[in-house]
Structures are given as C-alpha cells and as structure tokens.
From Swiss-Prot:
Domain Helicase C-terminal per the UniProt entry, residue ranges: 493-644
Keyword Nucleotide-binding among UniProt keywords: yes
Record EC number: 3.6.4.-
Recorded family membership: Belongs to the SNF2/RAD54 helicase family. RapA subfamily.
GO biological process, one term: regulation of DNA-templated transcription
Source organism of this protein record: Sodalis glossinidius (strain morsitans)
Keyword Nucleus among UniProt keywords: no
Stored NCBIfam families: PRK04914.1
This protein's UniProt keywords: Activator, ATP-binding, DNA-binding, Helicase, Hydrolase, Nucleotide-binding, Transcription, Transcription regulation
Protein name, UniProt field: RNA polymerase-associated protein RapA
Enzyme class: hydrolase
Purpose of the protein: Transcription regulator that activates transcription by stimulating RNA polymerase (RNAP) recycling in case of stress conditions such as supercoiled DNA or high salt concentrations. Probably acts by releasing the RNAP, when it is trapped or immobilized on tightly supercoiled DNA. Does not activate transcription on linear DNA. Probably not involved in DNA repair.
Binding site for ATP: D177, E178, V179, G180, L181, G182, K183, T184
Motif DEAH box: chain residues: 280-283
C-alpha cells in the first residue's frame, strides 16, 4: 500500500476509533494516530486491516473546526487529497479543505459510505440482516403478535381473553374464571401482549403474601417477565438510592399486606405512574357502602391512579351480588356507583341471558322474547335478523348466530368481565379418591394427650392445625431427631405404594418442608427410590432442577416430594398419581394441591391417594372434604363459603378428634348446604357471558393457527444462524434440546438471557412444558428479540460484496442488491407495527438500472454467491465506484414508487380498521354503558395519531451488496 504522512485511513476492525492519520512509516510498518480516542495503532504495510478514506464529488464532509463542505472537485498532490467546494455555513464557494484537517470523529454508518470506505462485512451477516428485517416485519404484522411466545398450552378460551383484552387501551377488566381455568395465565398473557406491543411499560402486581412466589415463578417461567419482589427489606434498601423506591423498577410484585401496613408506601406506589395494576384474590377485599375495609380502600386508591386494572377473583355466584358489585366499582366507579341500580340492571340482563338460551337451543322465540331483543338491540339494525329468527331454514341459524354475537357486544358487563366455567370449557379429566385408613400409632396417641395437657391455653384454631400433623407434635416433645417415620404407618404405606407403581410418576404433597425432606431420606435409604424434593427453602434454580429431575422420562425421579408452599405455581400434568401425605386445613389449599395435576392438558384421570390415621383430625377432615363438600372428586366453588360458615364447629372437631358426637349430622348439613349453593350457582349461570368469555369457534381457530406456528423451520434456521454469528455456542442434547453458552468470540461481551452457566432451550412447546428448566424459543422470546435488536441496531451486515460464478454473464458484470426499509417513527403505544412495521424492500439492479428482484428470489440467489477477501473487495469497490453511484441513483427512483404504495396501503388499512372500531364502539355506547367515555376518546385520538404518523412515514437504505460476476 502507498502511504504518505497526513493521509486519512479508517480501521476495518475498530470502526469506533474514528478517522486515523498516518504519522509515521518505514519499509515494513505504518503508524496511525486516532486523535478522537488518543490511541496509536501500528500496522504491517503489506496486510494492514485499514481502508483509505477518499470522498467523492457530491459528498458532504466536516472540518476539524466544525464547518461542513459540499465537495465539487478533488485535487491530489503527492498522495494527499484536497477537497474543493461550497461551505454550507456561509455559502462561500471555492473553499478548500485538506484531508489532514478533516474531523477525526468521522465514522461510516450509512451502507453506501461503509461500502466505499472499504468497511465490508461478511456475506452471511448481510443475509442475516435481510432475514432479520424480513422476519421482524412479518411477525409484527401477524394479528396474534404477543400471544404465541408464552410457555403454556394453547387453550382457546385463554387466548380469546388475552387477545380481546390485550388489544384494548388501558384495559380494566374482571377475570372470574372458575378455579383451574388459568386466570393467572390469562393475566400474564394480557401483560405480555400489552408490553410487547408498547401499550404498557410499567406493571404493578399486588397479591396475598402466600401467592408471591407463585406469581414470581409464573411470570418468569411462562412469560419471561422479570418482576422485582418488594418486601420490607427491599423497600428500605431502595430508599437509600431513590426518593421513590418503586421508580427503580419497571415490573414490581408485592403483597397486599406490604402495601396496607404503611401509608408512605401507598403514597409512593400511587406516584410511580404505572400502566397496569393486577390484583389477585380480589374477592377477599371486603366492602360495604358504609364501611369498606382498609384493603379495599388501598386497592381503590391505586385503581384510581392507574389506567389499566386487572382484577382476578372468584366467580360472581360464589361472591354474592354485593361483593361482585364492589369489584366492578373498582374498575369503573362512574359506571357502577349505585348498588340498587346495578342489581336492577342485572335482573334485566338475566332475562336477556334466558332469551339467549332459547337462541342457542334453537327454540322458537315468543312475542315477549322478540320484544326484549328488539329493545336490547335498538340502533343496531337488527330488525331483519329478528324477522328471520323463527324461520325453519339455514338462514334461521345464521340469524341466531349473528343476534347472539350482537347481544354479546351489548351485554351489560361483557366488556368488563370474563368468566369461564369447567362445564362450559370441557376437556377436564375425572378425579378419583382412594382413601386408606391406617391405625393411629400409640406414640402419637401419647403425644396427643401430652399436647392436650400442655396446650390448654392454645387458641382453638391453633390446636386444630397442630392435630392435623401428628409428626410435628411428636417432634416437639421428642426433639428434631425423633424418628417418627419408623412407626408412622403412612411411611411404610408410601414405600409399598411406590414399589407397586414403579413405572408411574407420583406427586407427594405434605404440609411442611421438614416432612418432605425426611420422607426423601427414608425412601432413598430403605428402598433406593429416586425422589426429588421441592420446598420453599430451595432457590429458584434448585427448584427448576428438582422439577426437571422429576420430569425426565429416562433417568428421572419416580416421586416428587413437595411442601405446601414449595409447590405453589408449579404444575405437573405429565403425572396423574397424587399422594396427600396429610391434608391441608382449608378447601382452597386442597384445590391448590389437586390443581398441580388437574389442569387443562391433563389427559388421564387423576388418582388421589390419601393415607390417613384413624381416630385423628385427618380422619375428620377427610370426611368433611369428601362427604360434606365433594371436594376431592369435583371442584368445590362453595368450599370457602362453607368453611367460613362452619369454621368454629369444624375447628372444634379437629381439635378434639375423639369427641365426635354430632359429626355425622354436621357433615350431612354441610352437604345439604353445599348442594343448595351449587344449584343456586348453576341457576345463576349467565350463558351469554360464558359464550362471550370462551370465544367460541374463532378462539379454537386462533389456537390452531398458533399451534401451526410452533416448530417454525424458519425460526429454527434463523436462530441457529443468529447464535453462530453472535458467537453463542450450541450444544445438542437429547429430546430436541440445545444448551446455549457464551463463547470467547462473542459480538458483545454480555448477551442478555444467556448466562455463563448456559441455558437450555427448545423450539418445541410440549417439550418446554414438560421440563421446567427449559426455555421455549419463539419469535417473541427475549433471546430472539435481543438478537434482532443487536443485528438491526448496528451496522453489522449493511455493506457486503460477493462473487457470482456465472458463465452466462460477461466477466465483470455488476449487480447491486439494495435493501431499503420503509418505516414510521412513532411512540410504541400507537402500535404502528400493526400496519407498517419496519418493512424491507429489496431491489436487485443491473448496470442499466433494471430491477431483477421479482425474478430472482433472495435465498436461491444467495446460495449461488461466494465470499471474497476484504482487501480484494475494497479494491473492487474502488475500481467500480462511479458505476455504483449511478446504480444507486436508479435505485432511489425505483424505490420511491414502491415505498409510497406500501405507505398508502398501510394508511388505508389503518383508517378502515380504526374507523370501523370507533364506529362500532359509538353504536354500542348507546346500548352498553360499560363502554367508557375515555375509551372512546382514546380510540379516536389513537386513530388521529396513527394516520398522522403514517403520513410522515419515510424510507432509507438499510443495506447494500455489490455482486461481481466471475468465471473462476
């Protein structure tokens, strides 16, 4: 290379150094000073990874003094360049600027500038960049964006609710599905979709203390949402660094008690500007018109300040009308301000729901029903449908379906409440109880007597709880080393049971972590039974390992021993055998235990085994659960209400299991009350609301569509290519698993979500569900999204040169591949990506400016190309630079027409969709006051802003590749 002192060069490998100046040279070496960074670099003359910087007429350059020059001509003298042109600051013409006086901060980021400066990327990076642009555009256009990346089964009713609510502005809804139908997953899906689409950025979740860990695990494992758990310690520490600790995190999880106990915390929470508030177990917020509870007031204050609110609650039939009204009042106090008016309205809608039953059952409608429907659907042009509804032909069916859909839209609370029932969803397995009575050991009888003598001052409920766990009482008196497992018949029963079911996975749940640990030791030492232990003392990583050990079909544990708290938030549908080593003290916990297996997706009947001690509190509680509530073999929506009603009596029987006078009558009374309440709930079912909540056939189609997206071969190929280029090592494991680890040649020193220890991934949803430690990779996973951002936010791959071996074309023939991006810069919450995501337009030009891209598909063409060494590529570019400039000019003219057509199409689509939604809501507002005024205003303003930003959309060159034909 010919070097001259004062020449300007740029580093091919360290672009961030800026413009370098030749300050020394000899026969073998050359020294460059990069004054921006104050660093020198010494290179070998013959093979230096640097490129001569030479600008062209028409370019604009900046002097070291800051003024800019539009170049007209260039002079070269003794190897040094002088640029002559017009100063842009004062208009002076004929100005000169020697290259040594160019601004050293200059870097090349535009694709054409990097190409001409010799900063040419590898061919595979150009291909990855184009694929990233293409896939990014396609994924954001998909209507299901935000729904498919969850690590959960694709359940139609859950997808319907998430899709319906997740696309709203500041949704305020009540999620009231029956237990086991996935309210937590629905809330997580809504949060995930709102965040992915830019509608929300800051989320606050408030739950009972006992559910904190469950929510933390669910949000992380299923949705890749990293919530920060705030407790007293975390809050106090954060106060040292911030005036408002809650502003230090975007996603916060805390308990209701944590908020309730401190007025300052509540003030800080209300000032932190959240987008969404999520409240679990909202039915425990006690309210009356004259005396609302402190808990209710806390949530009411938060709900007043936070635009989006999701309340997770028991079904309205369980709560009673007034309690249900209290929940709705939190969502929309203007709409639900008068309880009596609400009760009257609900009675009116009850008549509508009954009429819907006639529609769904294909029964004829009498005059009263027709009048009611006409009144309810006034203003919606339903007269023609009503006239056809009693006709006995196919049109009749169509009219009934359309009328039902219109009623769902106009239903009183259908926009603010979703409630699915097991009866409506179907697909659940049967539950079978296998109770095994075992003799009460003498050691426990003695311990009970001693406890009775010594615990005379205990509260009744404390005494009752102690009596449920005799091994705990025995250890209190004999010490922690007491070997209760040597005489407790439940232990030997468990050993024999597991030996009989060697080929089955068995979940064992007990109340205390200590019991689980002791049982694992016994199983291991007595019979060598492989068991994993799961309790609250384990870290999240250790729990994952235990769950994975249990899930492994080949060499995994036969049994998983869980404590009560440790099992929260984990589901094991692949197992169907459950052993309750003891019983929990309330029906909610019992259902929570069974719910570890009894989930949608369970394909076998659940066998519930309860070894219990005769003449003990366990025997009493077993009878009450089974005979009084039917809580083992069916879900028990009445359980909590009856538990609260009968609390004192039940605790008395549990505290003194030997005094059973009247127990049978008590249990019979409970069963009668249970049956009556259940019948009352069934009678109160709102079929219209259920129909609206489960989504019907469209929800099933959505689930099927998403299922077809799983195992997308394009995603797999793109991800593996991405990992290779970023420098993430991949180790194949069995069962479609990959282990990702950072390598020594990473593009970035620290890639998010890939730790030093590595992470296990799969592209298979079922595999991810079966193995807790495995991450489910989709287009929405942070690893893929961060990889896309890494590629597209840098210059990587935006400049390339390739050789095309084709003897049908003359040697030296030039082709220019141009990737333009059409985009609109707008706030994320407008979701312009629905209409115009950053969309690539590809041109493939010959020397005459003819676009060959429609005839030459990218992937097929790319496979015919060969790489070329960088120095050779740099020389080739320099030799043909004038021709490339001309081809670029042709490209600018060609792309303008295509880009504007794309923008016009996006604007028309946005106008059509958003105008239709606004018109629909305005029409419904007349018959459904649940549609809020601010929601209408938000939709109208959203439409205006979207159309304005689409009008301002533009395009730019994102990547360039020069192709040179060769015959070698």
């Amino acid at each position: 290379m010919p070097f001259t002192l004062g020449q300007r060069w740029i580093s091919d490998t360290e672009n961030e150094l800026g413009l370098g100046t030749v300050v020394a040279q000899d026969a073998r070496m050359v020294t460059l000073l990069f004054s921006t960074s104050g660093e020198n670099r010494l290179y070998a003359r013959t093979d230096a990874p640097i490129t001569r910087v030479m600008f062209n007429p028409g370019d604009t350059v900046t002097s070291h003094e800051g003024w800019q020059l539009l170049i007209d001509t260039i002079e070269e003298k003794e190897g040094l360049l002088t640029y002559i042109g017009t100063r842009l600051d004062n208009g002076e013409t004929g100005c000169t600027l020697r290259e040594v006086l160019l601004d050293s901060k200059l870097t090349f980021s535009k694709p054409q500038d990097r190409l001409f400066a010799g900063q040419i990327d590898r061919m595979d990076r150009f291909a990855l960049r184009y694929r990233a642009r293409k896939f990014y555009s396609e994924q954001f256009r998909a209507p299901w964006n935000g729904l498919r990346g969850i690590r959960a089964s694709l359940i139609p009713h859950q997808l319907h609710i998430a899709s319906e609510v997740g696309q709203r502005h500041a949704p305020r809804v009540l999620l009231a599905d029956e237990v086991g139908l996935g309210k937590t997953i629905e809330a997580g899906m809504i949060i995930h979709q709102q965040m992915l689409t830019g509608r929300a950025e800051r989320v606050l979740i408030v739950v009972p203390e006992s559910l904190l860990h469950q929510w933390l695990v669910e949000m992380l494992r299923r949705f890749n949402l990293h919530f920060s758990l705030f407790d007293d310690e975390r809050y106090s520490q954060s106060l040292l660094d911030s005036d408002n600790p809650f502003e230090t995190e975007q996603l916060v999880l805390c308990s209701l008690d944590f908020v309730r106990r401190n007025k300052e915390r509540l003030t800080h929470l209300t000032e932190a500007e959240w987008d969404i508030l999520v409240v679990d177990e909202a039915h425990h917020l006690a309210w009356s018109e004259t005396a609302p509870s402190r808990e209710y007031q806390v949530i009411e204050r938060l709900a007043h300040h936070i635009p989006g609110v999701l309340l997770l609650t028991a079904t309205p039939e369980q709560l009673g009308m007034q309690s249900h009204f209290a929940r709705l009042r939190l969502l929309d106090p203007n709409r639900f301000h008068d309880y009596q008016a609400f009760a009257d309205e609900q009675q009116r809608y009850r008549l509508v729901a009954d009429t819907v039953g006639l529609l769904l059952n294909n029964e004829l409608l009498d005059a009263a029903a027709m009048t009611l429907l006409a009144e309810m659907l006034g203003g919606q042009n339903a007269d023609a449908l009503l006239a056809r509804v009693n006709e006995q032909n196919a049109a009749d069916d169509d009219a009934r379906r359309r009328l039902t859909a219109m009623l769902m839209d106009s239903h009183g609370t259908s926009r603010v409440m979703f409630r699915n029932t097991r009866q409506g969803v179907k697909g659940f397995p049967a539950r079978r109880l296998h109770a095994c009575a075992l003799p009460l050991p003498a050691q426990y009888q003695t311990a009970f007597k001693v406890a009775g003598i010594m615990g005379g001052k205990q509260r009744l409920d404390e005494s009752a709880r102690h009596m449920l766990y005799p091994e705990q009482i025995f250890q209190q008196f004999e010490g922690q080393n007491a070997t209760w497992w040597n005489f407790d018949p439940r232990v030997q029963w468990l050993v024999d049971f597991l030996l009989d079911l060697r080929q089955e996975k068995v979940l064992v749940i007990c109340a205390h972590a200590g019991t689980a640990l002791q049982l694992e030791q016994v199983l291991r030492e007595r019979e060598g039974i492989r068991a994993a232990v799961f309790h609250e003392g384990l870290s999240l990583v250790d729990r994952d390992r235990a769950a994975a050990y249990f899930a492994s079909a080949e060499d995994g544990a036969q049994v998983l021993l869980c404590s009560e708290i440790g099992s929260e938030g984990r589901n094991f549908q692949f197992a169907s055998q459950m052993v309750m080593f003891d019983l929990p003290f309330n029906p909610d916990l019992l259902e929570q235990r069974i719910g570890r297996l009894d989930r949608i997706g369970q394909n076998r009947d659940i066998q519930i085994h309860v070894p219990y001690l005769e003449q003990s509190a366990q025997a009493v509680l077993l009878r009450w659960y089974h005979e009084g509530l039917d809580a083992f073999e069916h879900t028990c929506p009445t359980g909590r209400a009856l538990y609260d009603e009968t609390y004192q009596t039940l605790q008395g029987y549990l505290a003194e299991p030997g005094a059973l006078t009247g127990l049978t009558a008590f249990i019979h009374d409970c069963r009668a009350r249970h049956d009556a309440l259940k019948a009352q709930m069934e009678q109160g079912r709102d079929r219209l609301l259920e129909l609206h909540s489960n989504g019907g056939e469209p929800a099933r189609v959505l689930a099927q569509t998403l299922a077809e997206q799983d195992n997308d071969s394009q995603l797999v190929n793109f991800a593996l290519n991405l990992f290779d280029i970023i420098g993430i090592s991949q180790e194949d494991r069995s069962d479609n698993l990959l282990v990702l680890k950072p390598s020594d040649h990473m593009l970035v020193p620290d890639f998010p979500d890939v730790s030093e220890e590595g992470c296990t991934i799969t592209f298979n949803r079922d595999q991810a569900l079966a193995r807790e430690e495995t991450q489910f990779i989709s287009w929405e996973h942070p690893i893929i999204r961060n990889g896309l951002d890494l590629v597209l936010s840098s210059e990587s791959g935006n400049s390339a040169l390739s050789l095309l071996k084709n003897k049908a074309l003359p040697v030296g023939t030039l082709l220019l591949e141009l990737i333009y991006v059409v985009e609109s810069q707008a706030p994320r919450n407008l979701q312009l990506n629905r209409f115009l995501p950053a969309t690539p337009l590809r041109l493939l030009l010959d020397k005459n400016g003819t676009n060959l891209a429609p005839q030459v598909e990218f992937e097929q063409f790319n496979r015919q190309l060969n790489a070329v060494k960088r120095h050779t590529a740099s020389k080739l570019v320099s030799a043909v630079q004038p021709e490339v400039h001309g081809m670029l000019t042709h490209g600018e003219h060609l792309v303008a027409e295509q880009a504007q057509a794309l923008i016009d199409e996006a604007r028309a689509q946005a106008d059509l969709l958003l105008s239709a939604e606004l018109s629909r809501l305005k029409a419904l507002r007349a018959v459904n006051p649940a549609i809020r005024d601010n929601e209408l205003e938000a939709v109208a303003e959203n439409r205006r802003q979207v159309l304005r930003h689409l009008d301002e959309a533009s395009w730019r060159l994102d990547a360039i590749r020069l192709i040179v034909v060769t015959h070698q």
